[in-house]
């Protein structure tokens, strides 16, 4: 596996994986069914050796009988003002139209679930949560997408309460009793979901959809209990390689276009670990931990586990190149659909080429709210 580094901007190097930390499972086993009651993600790894049970937090915020925020809509058919709309042959949600650049149709839901599986494979213990957390706690997933992470956590911890929020109401209605979804919900708008009440808040793949990271981190900090943790998972999509196989390729040019277009919308997809850590510190977080994992674009590496990660990431990135490009390129550059598809087809072809030793970087952060006991 690529070496996990805790040092900012240290070069990613190759290292042999621990064979006991994973079991081989081919991509052909992936099930993209929409029920999501049981994904193929591995069990959650709890970092602490022993996690004592805790009573629900006492706070002044109103909750419904499930421990969720009172007055917040559960999953339901959206009213007319939230109807979906078509653009470039894809379906987008109408709530806060144009804020989020990605579609929400069946194809996109499959893509998000592929990334969910990829993250469990790439993080060598195949865990969903790395930060310390109580098994019967309150977990909040921001931008939950299909809800698969929240559902898996709810299955793992039946005595916990898990909530997911998202702009698009695409989560399944048949979720575990200890899991609730609130959508449409814009986590960048002012919100109160029980300040000082959550044991862990999770955010995955937020780059490209967030306008102000500092304000978001401050709001997350207010909602965590003292001593509780925030965990964030992001991908830096800038193509990298340790040789010259990327020189002059459309893959690099495509990313520069994508970077510029999303910067122009004030929601950049480019990820900076240095800025992320600085924003977390300025928001008031402590004990910030940063890990990096390399994601090969295709199985060019000889190592068996590297090839497994690469197969999953190749599937994920091949479903992402056009999806990430459609709205930014058409809305900002005013390119027509044929031009976008011509460019993205060439990029996908290069992503499949084993002679091109490209990779992206997966970034994982854990940050603690000061105070409270240590788990």
Swiss-Prot record:
The keyword Nucleotide-binding does not apply. Disulfide bonds: none annotated. It comes from Aspergillus niger (strain ATCC 1015 / CBS 113.46 / FGSC A1144 / LSHB Ac4 / NCTC 3858a / NRRL 328 / USDA 3528.7). Methyltransferase that performs automethylation. No other methyl-accepting substrate has been identified yet. Component of the velvet transcription factor complex that acts as a global regulator for secondary metabolite gene expression. Controls the expression of the citric acid, demethylkotanin, orlandin, asperrubrol, tensidol B, atromentin and JBIR8 gene clusters. Also represses the expression of genes related to the production of BMS-192548 and aspernigrin A. One of its GO terms (biological process) is methylation. Disruption phenotype: Results in a complete absence of citrate production. Keywords: Methyltransferase, Nucleus, S-adenosyl-L-methionine, Sporulation, Transcription, Transcription regulation, Transferase. Its EC number is 2.1.1.-. It catalyses: L-methionyl-[protein] + S-adenosyl-L-methionine = S-methyl-L-methionyl-[protein] + S-adenosyl-L-homocysteine. One of its GO terms (cellular component) is nucleus. This is Secondary metabolism regulator laeA. It is an enzyme of class 2 (transferase). Component of the heterotrimeric velvet complex composed of laeA, veA and velB; VeA acting as a bridging protein between laeA and velB. Belongs to the methyltransferase superfamily. LaeA methyltransferase family. It comes from the Eukaryota.
């Amino acid at each position: 596996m690529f070496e996990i580094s805790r040092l900012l901007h240290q070069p990613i190097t190759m290292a042999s994986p621990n064979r006991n930390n994973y079991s081989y499972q081919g991509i052909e086993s992936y099930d993209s069914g929409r029920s999501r009651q049981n994904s193929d993600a591995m069990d959650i790894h709890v970092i602490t050796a022993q996690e004592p049970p805790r009573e629900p937090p006492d706070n002044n915020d109103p909750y419904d009988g499930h421990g969720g925020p009172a007055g917040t809509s559960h999953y339901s058919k959206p009213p007319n003002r939230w109807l979906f709309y078509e653009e470039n042959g894809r379906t987008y949600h109408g709530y806060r139209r144009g804020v989020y650049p990605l579609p929400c149709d069946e194809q996109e839901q499959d893509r998000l679930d592929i990334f969910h599986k990829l993250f469990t494979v790439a993080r060598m213990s195949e865990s969903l949560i790395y930060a310390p957390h109580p098994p019967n706690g309150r977990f909040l997933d921001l931008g939950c997408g299909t809800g698969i992470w929240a559902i898996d956590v709810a299955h793992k911890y039946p005595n916990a309460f898990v909530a997911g929020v998202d702009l698009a109401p695409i989560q399944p209605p048949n979720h575990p009793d200890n899991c609730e979804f609130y959508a449409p919900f814009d986590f960048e708008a002012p919100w109160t979901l029980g300040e000082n009440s959550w044991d862990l808040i999770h955010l995955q793949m937020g780059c490209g959809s967030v306008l102000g990271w500092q304000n978001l981190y401050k709001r997350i900090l207010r909602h965590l209990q003292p001593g509780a943790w925030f965990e964030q998972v992001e991908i830096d999509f800038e193509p990298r390689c340790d040789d010259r196989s990327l020189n002059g390729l459309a893959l690099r040019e495509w990313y520069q276009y994508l970077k510029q277009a999303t910067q122009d919308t004030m929601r950049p997809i480019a990820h900076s670990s240095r800025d992320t850590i600085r924003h977390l510190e300025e928001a008031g977080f402590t004990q910030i931990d940063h890990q990096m994992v390399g994601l090969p674009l295709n199985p060019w590496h000889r190592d068996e586990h590297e090839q497994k990660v690469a197969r999953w990431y190749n599937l994920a990135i091949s479903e992402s190149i056009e999806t990430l490009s459609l709205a930014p390129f058409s809305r900002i550059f005013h390119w027509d659909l044929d031009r976008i598809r011509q460019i993205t087809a060439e990029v996908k072809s290069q992503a499949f080429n084993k002679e091109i030793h490209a990779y992206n970087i997966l970034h994982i952060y854990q940050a603690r709210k000061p105070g409270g006991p240590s788990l």
